[in-house]
Each structure stands twice: as C-alpha cells, then as structure tokens.
C-alpha cells in the first residue's frame, strides 16, 4: 500500500508544478503593462468639449515587430466585468476609432473624422492616448472604455482596458466647466485583482485535464505494479506443497481439499547380518520369556533367623 501512496503524492506534486508554471506564464503579461485612468468621473455641462484620457503604464516593448492597437468605445457597467460590451460612440465603432502605432511612430485619427462626428483620437510617445468630444449632449452620458491590444508578429498577445464615466448635465445644477474626479487606488486594485482572478480561473480550467491525465497515468502504473506483485506472491504460494492436504480435481468449478491419511509405522525387528537377532535367543538377559518361564529369576529362600545354637 505504500507504493501507490508515494506515486500519488508524486503525481500531485508534478501537477502542482505544472499548474504553477502555466499560471506564471499566463499571468506574466498581466504584470508587464496595464492601462490607468487618471480620472474616473467627468462632469460637464451641455455644449462643452471634453477630453477623456488613458495612460499605458509598465514596461512596453518598442521593437519593430510589436504594434499597439488602441481604441475607444462605449459600454455598460456589468455585474461581473466592466467594458465587456462594445457600443459605438456617436455611430462610430471601435474599429473606426482605433490607433495603430509602433515603438517609434505616433498616430492621430484623421481631421475629417473629427469634423464629421465631433471626435478626435490622439496618442503620444509617453503612453498617453485620449479621445476628444465636442459639443456634448445628454446622449453622450455613459461609460467610456479605452482598449490597448499588444500585437506581436500579427498575433494578439495581450489586451488591457480602462473605464471612466461621463455625466453631461444641463440647467442650474450644471457646472460652468468640466469637473474631473481622480481615480481611487482601490478601484485600480479591484480591477487588477479581478483580472488576475479571471486569468487564474481560465488557466486552472485549461490545466485541469492535463493534471487529471497525469494522475490517471500514475495510478494506472501503481495498479499494474500491485497486480504484478500479487501474481508473483500467488505463484510462490502455489509452488509450496502442503503435506497435510492434496488438491483434488474440482467438482463443478469448486475446488476441494482432500485429506491425506496419516502414515502408520509398525516397528519390526530387522534381521542381522548372521540371520539371527540377539533378542531372539532365549538365553539372553533381555530376551522375552519362553512358554512357562518367568521373566524375573527366582531367588533362594532366606532363613528367618540364624541358628545360634550352632557355634
């Protein structure tokens, strides 16, 4: 029983090691860079212009084979994850508002797009990128998201996003200019923790079949070894003959044990080389008595008292 336990413990150690490696590989890009929002809430009066800003933080690879895809879209606050829904901004989708730039190139959207829809996207070399909205209306209120996708060799490697809310007010309670509220560190930590938890769950689900397969292989090997040990022990037991029992042919498939009768031994006199045995001679001291003889020798009578008269 000790061998299977050791094998199972080893399999679980290997499974934990594989899970840790996959988790580190999957969460490595999460810690590489992220998107920060300097302001989480913008409150602006109707008809005003506003610029929503996001900032790319962390080490960013500036190789020629790396491209960053940046864009904007509207969304709604979900119960599980923010920015999961992608809605257009003033009838422009996130494909229309995207920015492509490499490590040594900045990009701006065309001036015609800004004039037609009152929008303009911009980015710089310091990781800041923004979208400017002119002539705000009440319909512009809502949640806005910025998205950054890292593309290596024409394949998407990693994507991060940030969220902020825009409130357009009218009337006496509306401010004269836009008022911005900075983001709290707790919100950023919650977003990062949620991203890490989601990545860990996904990697765990992907690694679970591999871990189960490894455990199954180890248990199968342990079962085969146990079966071989049992067969070897059975062969050794069958090779030793029991002197008290003899296996008889089975009757109707049920083996029976046949009892051997104990061997009887009768002591007999073995003849000597001369053909006669000492005990067979009648005159020997240890020979059995003949017919009419007494085994013990007879003794002469002893007088009761000495004759004192004869001196």
UniProtKB/Swiss-Prot annotation:
The modification Phosphoserine is found at residues 235, 248. The chain crosses the membrane at residues 195-215. Residues 216-311 are cytoplasmic. At the cell surface, may be cleaved by MMP14. N-glycosylated. It is found in: Cell membrane. Residues 33-168 form the Ig-like V-type domain. Residues 267-311 are annotated as: Disordered. SMART domains: IG. Immunoregulatory receptor which inhibits the T-cell response. May promote differentiation of embryonic stem cells, by inhibiting BMP4 signaling. May stimulate MMP14-mediated MMP2 activation. Disulfide bonds join 54-146. Its main location: membrane. InterPro entries: Ig-like_dom, Ig-like_dom_sf, Ig-like_fold, Ig_sub, Ig_V-set, VISTA. This is V-type immunoglobulin domain-containing suppressor of T-cell activation. GO terms for biological process: negative regulation of alpha-beta T cell activation; negative regulation of CD4-positive, alpha-beta T cell proliferation; negative regulation of CD8-positive, alpha-beta T cell proliferation; negative regulation of interleukin-10 production; negative regulation of interleukin-17 production; negative regulation of tumor necrosis factor production; negative regulation of type II interferon production; positive regulation of cell migration. It is a single-pass type I membrane protein. The keyword Mitochondrion does not apply. Residues 33-194 are extracellular. Keywords: Cell membrane, Disulfide bond, Glycoprotein, Immunoglobulin domain, Membrane, Phosphoprotein, Receptor, Signal, Transmembrane, Transmembrane helix.
């Amino acid at each position: 029983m000790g061998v299977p336990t050791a094998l199972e413990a080893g399999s679980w150690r290997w499974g934990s090691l594989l899970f840790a490696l996959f988790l580190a590989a999957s969460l490595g890009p999460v810690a590489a860079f992220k998107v920060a929002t300097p302001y989480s809430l913008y409150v602006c009066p109707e008809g005003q212009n506003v610029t929503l800003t996001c900032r790319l933080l962390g080490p960013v690879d500036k190789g020629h084979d790396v491209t960053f895809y940046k864009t904007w879209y509207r969304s709604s606050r979900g119960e599980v994850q923010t920015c999961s829904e992608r809605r257009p901004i003033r009838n422009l989708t996130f494909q229309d508002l995207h920015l492509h730039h490499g490590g040594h190139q900045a990009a701006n959207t065309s001036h015609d797009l800004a004039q037609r829809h009152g929008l303009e996207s911009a980015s710089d070399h310091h990781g800041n990128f923004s979208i400017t909205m002119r002539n705000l209306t009440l319909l512009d209120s809502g949640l806005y998201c910025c998205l950054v996708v890292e593309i290596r060799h024409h394949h998407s490697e990693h994507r991060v996003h940030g969220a902020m809310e825009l409130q357009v007010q009218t009337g006496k309670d509306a401010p004269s200019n836009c008022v911005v509220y900075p983001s709290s560190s707790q919100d950023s930590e919650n977003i990062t923790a949620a991203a890490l938890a989601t990545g860990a769950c996904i990697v765990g689900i992907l690694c679970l079949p591999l871990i189960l397969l490894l455990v199954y292989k180890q248990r199968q090997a342990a079962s085969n070894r146990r079966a071989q040990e049992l067969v070897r022990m059975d062969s050794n037991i069958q090779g030793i003959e029991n002197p008290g029992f003899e296996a008889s042919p089975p009757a109707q498939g049920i083996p029976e044990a046949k009892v051997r009768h104990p061997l009887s031994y009768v002591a007999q006199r073995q003849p000597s080389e001369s053909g006669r045995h000492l005990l067979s001679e009648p005159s020997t001291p240890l020979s059995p008595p003949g017919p009419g003889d007494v085994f013990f020798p007879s003794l002469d009578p002893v007088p009761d008292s000495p004759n004192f008269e004869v001196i």
